[in-house]
Amino acid sequence: MEIQFLGTGAGQPSKSRNTQAIALKMLDERNEIWLFDCGEASQHQILNTAIKPRKITKIFITHLHGDHIFGLPGFLSSRSFQSSDEQTDLDLYGPVGIKEFVLAGLRISGSHLGYRINFHEIDSAGKIFEDDSFEVYTDLLDHTIFCLGYRVVEKNRVGELDANALKEAGLPFGPLFGKIKKGEVVDYDGKTFDPKDYIGADKVGKIVTILGDTRKTNTAVRLAWQADLLVHEATYEAAESKMARAHGHSTTKQAADVAKEAGVNRLLLTHISARYVGPLVGQLVREAQDVHANTFVAKDLYEEKIG
């Protein structure tokens, strides 16, 4: 898994930071990309990456403020144009009202999509998605309007098959290897091959938590518990805690406190006020690292491998 930030600014675009959008790239795990929020000009930012819109199969919206959703109608339309040969359905998760917003934009603009949008409007905490390899949980944060955070949990995967040991034990390479990998006991040439003797320990899945705008809250700690990566907003420097609270946001220190309390491995800060440019960004990093050392302030198009 990899994460890439398409926009890291707060409120409105600036010369150095676009509005909010984050791509969780799971190409190796499921050949998909999941998008978290879709602020204005997100599709333009995508043009500066290797992301293919048709690979985006799920979009998770944290809340309905414009800097998190104004890019949706344009992106959804362009996804249809750019994916004419492979029209795959898209799942859209978000607060109640996201369906009305999207459909109104498409209807008024006369836009017609070549794929289906499956809307999943959320009004309470809980598990919102599960398949054989992933689960997604959501909970309510503390912002000025209804706002969500998301916890993406990769399920543990079967360990590596020791092919050399099987060959040395007399099992020829072929379909029987696959059966053992699936956990089946195999009898061959008078011998019994038990999977537990030839498969290593399970590979522990990654946990990624991506939060919308929020004050410091215990909900954030729960969503981020023992996560490999936490993406937390840090609109303000530590000295502006009163302003942060008044506007429903967090400071660098508050975000780092959440990461520390939750036992998070890596903390990436986003939703940075336009007032922080140049050396001031370094100040934000230092403030957070004083509390949680493994912290970085993301910038537009920044990408890193998770774990």
Swiss-Prot record:
<feature type="binding site">
    <location>
        <position position="68"/>
    </location>
    <ligand>
        <name>Zn(2+) 2</name>
    </ligand>
</feature>
<feature type="binding site">
    <location>
        <position position="271"/>
    </location>
    <ligand>
        <name>Zn(2+) 2</name>
    </ligand>
</feature>
<feature type="binding site">
    <location>
        <position position="65"/>
    </location>
    <ligand>
        <name>Zn(2+) 1</name>
    </ligand>
</feature>
<dbReference type="InterPro" id="IPR001279">
    <property type="entry name" value="Metallo-B-lactamas"/>
</dbReference>
<dbReference type="InterPro" id="IPR036866">
    <property type="entry name" value="RibonucZ/Hydroxyglut_hydro"/>
</dbReference>
<feature type="binding site">
    <location>
        <position position="63"/>
    </location>
    <ligand>
        <name>Zn(2+) 1</name>
    </ligand>
</feature>
<feature type="active site" description="Proton acceptor">
    <location>
        <position position="67"/>
    </location>
</feature>
<keyword id="KW-0378">Hydrolase</keyword>
<comment type="similarity">
    <text>Belongs to the RNase Z family.</text>
</comment>
<keyword id="KW-0479">Metal-binding</keyword>
<dbReference type="GO" id="GO:0008270">
    <property type="term" value="F:zinc ion binding"/>
</dbReference>
<dbReference type="InterPro" id="IPR013471">
    <property type="entry name" value="RNase_Z/BN"/>
</dbReference>
<keyword id="KW-0819">tRNA processing</keyword>
<comment type="function">
    <text>Zinc phosphodiesterase, which displays some tRNA 3'-processing endonuclease activity. Probably involved in tRNA maturation, by removing a 3'-trailer from precursor tRNA.</text>
</comment>
<dbReference type="Pfam" id="PF00753">
    <property type="entry name" value="Lactamase_B"/>
</dbReference>
<keyword id="KW-0540">Nuclease</keyword>
<keyword id="KW-0862">Zinc</keyword>
<feature type="binding site">
    <location>
        <position position="213"/>
    </location>
    <ligand>
        <name>Zn(2+) 2</name>
    </ligand>
</feature>
<dbReference type="GO" id="GO:0042781">
    <property type="term" value="F:3'-tRNA processing endoribonuclease activity"/>
</dbReference>
<keyword id="KW-0255">Endonuclease</keyword>
<protein>
    <recommendedName>
        <fullName>Ribonuclease Z</fullName>
        <ecNumber>3.1.26.11</ecNumber>
    </recommendedName>
</protein>
<feature type="binding site">
    <location>
        <position position="67"/>
    </location>
    <ligand>
        <name>Zn(2+) 2</name>
    </ligand>
</feature>
<comment type="subunit">
    <text>Homodimer.</text>
</comment>
<feature type="binding site">
    <location>
        <position position="143"/>
    </location>
    <ligand>
        <name>Zn(2+) 1</name>
    </ligand>
</feature>
<feature type="binding site">
    <location>
        <position position="213"/>
    </location>
    <ligand>
        <name>Zn(2+) 1</name>
    </ligand>
</feature>
